[in-house]
């Protein structure tokens, strides 16, 4: 059987498995998938012909991985230890591995095994969960979290305290995706498989899930689950039909192209909104 077939069949029986009862074939398959996710040769989601395709079987392998091991003590330095079942990505790395990978990891940043961190990425004190893919040149700023299986594009900036949702808790069908050259403002949350398309700017304190209304100020259109490429987005509200109250929404205040982005600072884009 192929790796995918082993994972698919095992996932149907996942409730039966524990570290003691999981067949060796399944353990080997799950570990193989985790290794490929860790080195970037496999992704939970990838863009093909302009559309994002989710490798659901890879996501299932991530879910199965939590039945591979019991919790065990993990020593970090002389006075700190953790108790978990998933090792950290950099636990046994040598200086040469860091040099070759071209990443910067600022203490106490944590990335779990099975996450991929590409060349030129800076991890400020932040958390990157299993199955996530962080592409070249991205900045994961202080106290930002990259959820399980989330996809972070090239040159993305996740500002301080940003939360990018994962697929594990609660269980989600599709990963959250932030495409290339996006800026996500401080304390914003993008969750539940929402896609923020290339070159978009999300202001500070914007919260977008699948049920969040995304209102385009220019067209009056309301959409869900996807921020169009080049959007500048701020938090706002829309009135109810009877005018008795207003409910939160995300507002697209303008669209910008790559040329405008290259000549204009993020603050200017938001101030001119």
Curated annotation (Swiss-Prot):
The cellular component terms of Gene Ontology attached to this UniProt record, alphabetical and capped at eight, are:
cytoplasm
Give the pathway annotation.
Amino-acid biosynthesis; L-lysine biosynthesis via DAP pathway; LL-2,6-diaminopimelate from (S)-tetrahydrodipicolinate (succinylase route): step 1/3
A biological process (GO) annotation for this entry?
Answer: lysine biosynthetic process via diaminopimelate
Q: What class of enzyme is it?
A: transferase
Amino-acid positions noted as binding substrate in the UniProt annotation, renumbered to this chain: 104, 141
Annotated family? Belongs to the transferase hexapeptide repeat family.
InterPro entries, per the entry: DapD_Trfase_Hexpep_rpt_fam (IPR005664), Hexapep (IPR001451), Hexapep_transf_CS (IPR018357), THP_succinylTrfase_dom1 (IPR023180), THP_succinylTrfase_N_sf (IPR037133), Trimer_LpxA-like_sf (IPR011004)
Q: Could you identify this protein by its name?
A: 2,3,4,5-tetrahydropyridine-2,6-dicarboxylate N-succinyltransferase
Record organism: Psychrobacter sp. (strain PRwf-1)
Q: Where is it located?
A: Cytoplasm
Name the principal localization, coarsely classed: cytoplasm
Which keywords appear in this protein's UniProt record, sorted alphabetically?
A: Acyltransferase, Amino-acid biosynthesis, Cytoplasm, Diaminopimelate biosynthesis, Lysine biosynthesis, Repeat, Transferase
What interactions and quaternary structure are annotated? Homotrimer.
Entry's Gene Ontology molecular function annotations: 2,3,4,5-tetrahydropyridine-2,6-dicarboxylate N-succinyltransferase activity; nucleotidyltransferase activity
Superkingdom field = Bacteria
Q: Which reaction does it catalyse?
A: (S)-2,3,4,5-tetrahydrodipicolinate + succinyl-CoA + H2O = (S)-2-succinylamino-6-oxoheptanedioate + CoA
Q: What is its EC number?
A: 2.3.1.117
